[in-house]
Amino acid sequence: MNKFYIYNNFKNEALINIKVKPYSKQNLINNFVIINNIPYIKLSITAAPEQGKANEGIINYLAKEWKLSRSSIEIIKGHTHSLKTILIKNINEDYLNLIINSYIK
């Protein structure tokens, strides 16, 4: 199985790719998908993809779901696209593995 994130041990940071579906019935991580040999977490968000609402919804949902501060999550790529890369700061790799593994079925 491909690794679903890139982890930097020196900075305690991780890069995670997500595929976002806006206008969903509920905020939910739906599993994973591989696109062009790159693994993405599938994330449904209720917010509309306009004026940054979906991006804000992504940060709010992931912070709450993963028990992280909102300031530790940043969208660094794909602000106007459904395929995004997020940076998670100040996260232990063991905790990140625990989070990711909880969604693998």
UniProtKB/Swiss-Prot annotation:
It comes from Rickettsia typhi (strain ATCC VR-144 / Wilmington). GO terms for cellular component: cytoplasm. Gene3D superfamilies: YggU-like. This is UPF0235 protein RT0827. Pfam families: DUF167. InterPro entries: DUF167, YggU-like_sf. Belongs to the UPF0235 family.
